[in-house]
Swiss-Prot record:
NCBIfam families: rplS_bact. This protein is located at the 30S-50S ribosomal subunit interface and may play a role in the structure and function of the aminoacyl-tRNA binding site. The gene is rplS. Belongs to the bacterial ribosomal protein bL19 family. This is Large ribosomal subunit protein bL19. The keyword Secreted does not apply. GO terms for molecular function: structural constituent of ribosome.
Amino acid sequence: MSNIIQAIEKEQMRSDMPKFAPGDTVIVRVRVKEGEKERLQAFEGVVIAKRNRGLHSAFTVRKMSSNGEGVERVFQTHSPIVGSVEVKRRGVVRQAKLYYLRELTGKKARIKEKLGKKK
């Protein structure tokens, strides 16, 4: 029975998701339906948490709005609402959950960038 469920879940999983981790800055394009029209809306922020549970995987993205308020949004990784995910920059962090960023503001909330290897 569980083999059948696993096979169906594997069939519904997305294969076009890039590899990203907490601390990375990502641009998530979300499908928004307004009346009859459908468009993609960009949500850019830092990944503060990632939950890997197969088809039920999710990740939390936090961005600072124009008035200084933090906005967090949880996205289901394999949801059809998520149009695409683009990694803008990779961050260096030593924790899996970056909930401490909620209390930090300004320059204290910055994350170091992971630079590429020199050849």
